[in-house]
Amino acid sequence: MLDAVGAAARAVHTLASGPLGVVVGISTDAGTRIEAVGAADAAGRPVLHGTRFDVASVSKVVATTTSIHRLASLGLLRLDEPIDRFVPGTRCAPGTAISTLMRHRAGLWEWQPLYLARTPDGDRADPYDALAALPLRYPPDDHRAYSDLGFILLGRMVEKITGLPLDRAVAQLVTVPLGLDATGYGPVTGDVAASAVGDGIEQEMIRTGVPYPVLYPAGDVAWRPYELVGEVNDGNCHRAFAGVSGHAGVFATAGDLLRLARSLAAADDHEDLWRPDVTSRIFAEGPDAGQALGWRTMPVQLDGQRRTMVWHPGFTGCGVGLVPGTGVAVTLLSNRLMSPEPLPTALLWATALEALGLADEAAH
């Protein structure tokens, strides 16, 4: 697998409408290898092994899920406790468990532009007040509906338990103990890849109500027309939460993501960080195929055996995954939204896994 990393990066980069720049990395007991190809921005600045990327929804696992994993390992929460114990006044059904939110089964809206919410006086509403005012979209614990809003609530819970702003809580619980020096919330400077040019995708979502009906009237928004480098792509994270949220906002390098994922892939060797019974719960698939607590699951082939990978994609073209109990970790970083017709992150991830020899043919 280590020898295939360069081929995997090139396979993703050379797809028709593939990303401008790609970094692929893998870590196993035999070592770690990272390969970079392409450009970090429209000017052609080369992407390097240590280039930081806006990892978008990978933040849900790198920041929020791992913080909850650590808090549960420390005995500061139980995964089946109700969210209202820590964040009162939500619209979640009474008794809705932390684990239910982590499985995206709380019935919340998938997304709403919270920065458009207004008070009765016409002032911008506090985003947490706006979130608490939204009705449920679905019956609670009925089915999975992937929700940014649920992870915004979970990030708020981490703040309430730790008494710290989320960026400091994630640093204290995750990035500092693991030595992830290049991982954290923005804004960031230095060698950072552009994530997109402007806010066009989100503008179109609001204008059309696709894929989700928008519950707020359109307002005056200072849309960004420029190349987004070092400031978060996600509109709610940028405008409503000043770049720090439970659902998005983290910037990271391939090396840091591999270090985190390898720690989790060999969690039994890191019981000071990850309590075994908590780790088993976090990685266990729930009622919905492909969904664990925070993490997603998928079959892969490893050493001729079918194994389960836990992983998570990000809208900007990034992903991280690991095979529990094996020490195997994989990451893909790209700036797919810089392409005129961006390919889905899932396709980029599948292409990388196939080139690495991890694809499970029976799953196709």
Question: What kind of feature is each model-predicted range?
Answer:
Residues 15-23, 43-101, 137-149, 245-248, ...:
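Short active-site loop at a secondary-structure junction
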Residues 243-251, 309-321, 334-340:
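Glycine-rich phosphate/pyrophosphate-binding beta-alpha loops
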Residues 1, 5, 55, 59, ...:
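Hydrophobic (often cysteine-bearing) scaffold residues that line and stabilize catalytic clefts
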Residues 38, 286-323:
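Short, Gly/Ser/Thr-enriched beta-strand-loop segments that form substrate-interacting elements
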Residues 266, 276-283, 340-364:
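Short, gly/Ser/Thr-rich active-site loops of penicillin-recognizing serine hydrolases
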Residues 94-304:
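Short, surface-exposed loop or secondary-structure junction motifs
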Residues 9, 24, 30, 60, ...:
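Residue-level preference for non-acidic, small/hydrophobic
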Residues 9-47, 79, 112-120, 295, ...:
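A short, well-structured edge-of-sheet supersecondary motif
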